[in-house]
Structures are given as structure tokens and as C-alpha cells.
Amino acid sequence: LPEQDFMRF
């Protein structure tokens, strides 16, 4: 998964 995906949480 992209780095930005975990940033969404």
C-alpha cells in the first residue's frame, strides 16, 4: 500500500 494510505487514518 502507498505511504499516503496510512496517513488517511
UniProtKB/Swiss-Prot annotation:
- Modification sites for Phenylalanine amide: F9
Q: Which GO terms describe its cellular component?
A: extracellular region
Biological processes, Gene Ontology terms: neuropeptide signaling pathway
Asked if Secreted is a keyword of the record, the answer is: yes
Please tell me whether the keyword Ribonucleoprotein is annotated for this protein: no
- At the top level of its lineage, which domain of life is listed? Eukaryota
| Tissues of expression | Expressed in the CNS and thoracic perisympathetic organs (tPSO) but not in the ring gland, midgut or abdominal perisympathetic organs (aPSO) (at protein level).
Kindly list the places in or outside the cell where this protein is found, as annotated in its UniProt entry. Answer: Secreted
Q: Which UniProt keywords apply?
A: Amidation, Neuropeptide, Secreted
Q: Which residues form a coiled coil?
A: none
Q: Which family does it belong to?
A: Belongs to the FARP (FMRFamide related peptide) family.
Protein function: FMRFamides and FMRFamide-like peptides are neuropeptides.
Q: What is this protein called?
A: FMRFamide-like neuropeptide LPEQDFMRF-amide
